[in-house]
Amino acid sequence: DFHRIFDGEFIEFVKELKAAGKIHAIGLSSHNPVIAKKAVETGLIDVLMFSVNPCYDMQPPDEDVEKLWADEVYEKTYRNFNPEREALYELCARRGVAIDVMKAYAGGDLLKADLSMFGKAMTPVQALDYALTRPAVAAVMAGCKTIDEIRQALAWCTATPEEKDYASVLANVEKC
């Protein structure tokens, strides 16, 4: 898929639209840090929609997004930040590629202790702060379904540093 997009007619068409002023930015959506990094390295994209949360940031990269939610993945102990994700975030920051975050709550799993790989629930404010403090992150799409969920997400705007602090959740990760 990567070569079909970046080596074909599609990218040429998109570049023409940008040059003509019909679009302002070229973006890409991905769940895989290796593919996303490769796209950023082309120098063609301006914005990357990417899944950012502490759960996914510790998992190995994969083409299959469904594996991010697999029980066997959550049952494993991950001890380190995924180096591919770290390299992607740093590259985006250096190149001025904005990251628009999706899946900040890991599909809701991070908000429930029994589903979180950390064994402890994060608050929406903590999950949003985690995402917003990664390099190159410009925005987070919280994925709210109800008015109450919107209020919980907006609470980040007035939250204290103590309310934003997610260290107590990540402290449950075993050390190397």
Task: State where each predicted segment sits.
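Beta/alpha (TIM)-barrel catalytic core signal, keyed to glycine-rich beta->alpha loops juxtaposed to Asp/Glu
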Residues: 1-176
